[in-house]
């Protein structure tokens, strides 16, 4: 008997669900276009060496690769679209002068499951601002994310802002032993003050830096910026990341973005993001509906160095939020993947 089931972690999208995702993508591209972003379409397959340049070593396990029968080249199914944008930007400086504002949508496929009930093929829509640095570009991305979440109809969306280098500066100043660094970052991701304090006690840095390490777990919520300023006074290496964050927030707030939270103890994206990071949340979504940040090191890997910042919206999580809070889309909720499959993130978006 013919087995009509799909491979693990994949699913079909029926007409109603497909129409809803298409509507979300269309609304997002309306906003992207108003901000001056131009749409590009990119292939599902890339040469493996191109994909590898855009991912961290840990993320390479998410890549599905095979030998292309015609050419014998090793190719990969894209686990992320940003490396493709970087490759395009480097390959076509004639058509894409700096700064370039590009937007996209499409599926990405990951090899590993990240959480039960989530498919490995994920539909995204996103933007990349290439060749522009500084607080103005950071704020542009923040404002665009906030406007995008509002445009798709999410109720009470919230943007959370961090900085990849703030916690890193404190950790480095504390001079933790090599054997404890990974555990300290894991503890920070759990907001585990006790574990952070235990690791910091074995550091060889200044007393001020060692005392600041467990405080990183509390740099969210009301008063987070005040607590971060106190840390930056004690650990001067953290002052520049804090100043960059506050500068972007000031501009974004002048442009009308009000629902912004801060978490400067965010550990996500270490080794990939180089500056401000952000995530978009909405009541009813199982996780962040969007993630992004500044990744100034990526473009140089493709031969056209420069600053870059962007974000991607997870259309499935946005759909969930609309269904559960706004009461829209009833009857088109995506079917849960079997226990055999799930989703894995190729990088920190």
UniProtKB/Swiss-Prot annotation:
Q: Name one GO biological process term.
A: histidyl-tRNA aminoacylation
> According to its UniProt record, where is this protein located?
Cytoplasm
* Residue stretches of biased makeup (Basic residues): 330-349
Q: Which GO terms describe its molecular function?
A: histidine-tRNA ligase activity
**Main location class:** cytoplasm
Q: Which GO terms describe its cellular component?
A: cytoplasm
Q: Which PROSITE patterns match?
A: AA_TRNA_LIGASE_II
Pathway per the UniProt entry = Amino-acid biosynthesis; L-histidine biosynthesis; L-histidine from 5-phospho-alpha-D-ribose 1-diphosphate: step 1/9
Q: How does it assemble?
A: Heteromultimer composed of HisG and HisZ subunits.
Q: What does this protein do?
A: Required for the first step of histidine biosynthesis. May allow the feedback regulation of ATP phosphoribosyltransferase activity by histidine.
Protein name as it appears in the record: ATP phosphoribosyltransferase regulatory subunit
């Amino acid at each position: 008997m013919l087995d009509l089931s799909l491979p693990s972690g994949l699913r079909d999208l029926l007409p109603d669900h497909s129409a809803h995702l298409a509507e979300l993508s269309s609304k997002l591209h309306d906003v992207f276009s108003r901000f001056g972003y131009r749409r590009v379409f990119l292939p599902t397959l890339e040469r493996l060496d191109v994909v590898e340049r855009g991912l961290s070593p840990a993320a390479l396990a998410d890549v599905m690769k095979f030998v292309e029968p015609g050419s014998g080249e090793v190719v990969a199914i894209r686990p992320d679209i940003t490396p493709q944008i970087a490759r395009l930007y480097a390959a076509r400086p004639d058509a894409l002068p700096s700064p370039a504002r590009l937007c996209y949508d499409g599926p990405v496929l990951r090899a590993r499951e990240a959480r039960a009930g989530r498919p490995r093929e994920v539909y995204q829509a996103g933007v990349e601002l290439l060749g522009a640095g500084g607080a103005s570009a950071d704020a542009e991305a923040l404002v665009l994310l906030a406007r995008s979440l509002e445009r798709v109809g999410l109720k009470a969306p919230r943007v959370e802002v961090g900085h990849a280098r703030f916690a890193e500066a404190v950790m480095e100043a504390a001079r933790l032993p090599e054997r404890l660094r990974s555990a300290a970052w894991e503890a920070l991701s759990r907001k585990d003050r006790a574990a952070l304090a235990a690791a910091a006690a074995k550091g060889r840095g200044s007393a001020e830096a060692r005392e600041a390490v467990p405080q990183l777990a509390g740099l969210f919520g009301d008063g987070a910026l005040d607590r971060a300023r106190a840390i930056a006074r004690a650990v001067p290496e953290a002052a520049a990341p804090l100043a960059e964050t506050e500068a972007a927030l000031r501009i974004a707030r002048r442009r009308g973005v009000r629902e912004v939270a801060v978490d400067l103890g965010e550990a996500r994206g270490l080794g990939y993001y180089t500056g401000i990071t952000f995530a978009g949340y909405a009541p009813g979504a199982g996780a962040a509906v969007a993630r992004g940040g500044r990744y100034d090191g990526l473009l140089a890997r493709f031969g056209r160095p420069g600053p870059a910042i962007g974000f991607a919206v997870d259309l499935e999580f946005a759909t969930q939020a609309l269904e559960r809070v706004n009461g829209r889309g009833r009857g088109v909720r995506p079917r849960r993947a079997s226990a055999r499959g799930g989703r894995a993130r190729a990088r920190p978006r």
